Curated annotation (Swiss-Prot):
Protein name: Uracil-DNA glycosylase
Highest taxon, organism lineage: Bacteria
Reactions catalysed, as given in the entry: Hydrolyzes single-stranded DNA or mismatched double-stranded DNA and polynucleotides, releasing free uracil
Keywords associated with the record: Cytoplasm, DNA damage, DNA repair, Hydrolase
Enzyme class, first EC level, given as a word: hydrolase
Function: Excises uracil residues from the DNA which can arise as a result of misincorporation of dUMP residues by DNA polymerase or due to deamination of cytosine.
SMART domains: UDG (SM00986), UreE_C (SM00987)
CDD domains with a match to the protein in the record: UDG-F1-like (cd10027)
InterPro entries cross-referenced by the UniProt entry: UDG_fam1 (IPR002043), Ura-DNA_Glyclase_AS (IPR018085), Uracil-DNA_glycosylase-like (IPR005122), Uracil-DNA_glycosylase-like_sf (IPR036895)
Gene it is expressed from: ung
Active site: 67 (proton acceptor)
EC number: 3.2.2.27
Predominant cellular place of this UniProt entry's protein: cytoplasm
GO cellular component: cytoplasm
Amino acid sequence: MEVKIEESWKEMLKSEFCKGYFKRLVSFIKNEYKTKKDKIFPPPRLIFNAFDTLPFKDIKVVILGQDPYHGKGQANGLAFSVNSDIKIPPSLQNIFKEIERSLKIKTIPNGDLTRWAEQGTFLLNSILTVEEGRPSSHKDIGWEIFTNEVIKIISKNLNNVVFMLWGNFAKGKKELIDTSKHLILETSHPSPYSAHNGFLGSNHFSKTLRYLQEHNKTTINFQ
């Protein structure tokens, strides 16, 4: 199982990789890919795509998701993102809609958010793998322990990061973040079921750009 992760992340996470729970997690995941072939998403090389695309020190914004898309060919290791040849999912359509409304710009009709990640947006799912057609199928196998630690490491070692917490699941991570040194933005999930309960009209993206400017950070083009 080939896994790619950027060097600075290897250094930040090396102690985590040595822990018993993580070794058990790796063993479970390896077996899933071995026995279920092409039914586990994303492909092994993209499990840590969020970490491989963005060096640790370059993180400016964190957007938290729950687990990867469970349809074939969708997940690419970045939360809310899909491969460029895949139809844009409803939640991401609403994200683009809110960006266009709040920033008065036209988004690119392409669901691959690598362009955001390369500018400093850490698109982190709490659970990094999933079985086809079974959302949350890899819940409680160790991923949440790992990604909670990741959030704590970001909070402790970086300053003035914007955390966008959408929906109750993401809001539950607030206790892991030092609110005295970071900006936390909370609202409903962008899913069609809840986007009208706060997400659409939240101005999270305009607030994010303003905060980055106030702290002398290069802003992000969210097109």
